[in-house]
């Protein structure tokens, strides 16, 4: 690390800089600090290099720690009498160190996906009486994929609890989505009731940390793009590519399963006012195939808080302005009734709308 740090310092302070001292100052719950004493053209200067301990306090992933330091660099110098942050430094896989600080915004460059997203299929279900072979093959492809990625497990109570906490409290999840609602969409006390029920579910699920699995994190129809050419790697007649993996690579498989299956319910309510036809068939088939492939029958006993989050998403007027107030009421009724039930029953989904 010291050689990499010396190379970084020469880039920032000039090639004549010399690292005179590099020693650990101490460590606490959050992380450790290191004293840097360097000889520059302007004289000897002392700095502190700070790190954050992984796993715990929301610092579980490198991106978490980067976010803390980027905010620190942005805000330290704006408060009177506060020490100033000089830079934010990243360490690469090869051990080299590089500045990532000073940006006013950040961007992600990624590959382009081609094909048709699964929203198109869900809309077309409204014109069918039953699923056709291609519809069933797509569900087979999606459940097979999820069964495969969810088979990768990780032993970490911290990360499982983090995912449970984020499902309710993250800015992109239940509470954050509710905060984005236009006033009048749902009374605040009704939002709070859903949140409180979800928190109670989190307490029930905490002992289930052995379920921690590799997940996509946002497995919804807009992020699933089906191609027109088959791929033998999936061993199916259908292939797809995914977008926008989100909010961490580890969690409960219920996160991915509910992200997709809420849409059979949502689209059916939107088009038909109840859950029936190809939508009900798709919902049942998805759970049937997934449980058969994974043996994870327990999943049906813990989907409730994940459905609360996903229900809040599809009922959001900002995301789906075409939804009528009556349809939103059905979705919120579904959410509350699922939260009140001990086990989700896909075959009786319409009972949750009453």
Residue spans of the language-model regions?
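A glycine-centered beta->alpha junction motif in the catalytic cores
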Residues: 54-55, 112-131, 175-184, 266, ...
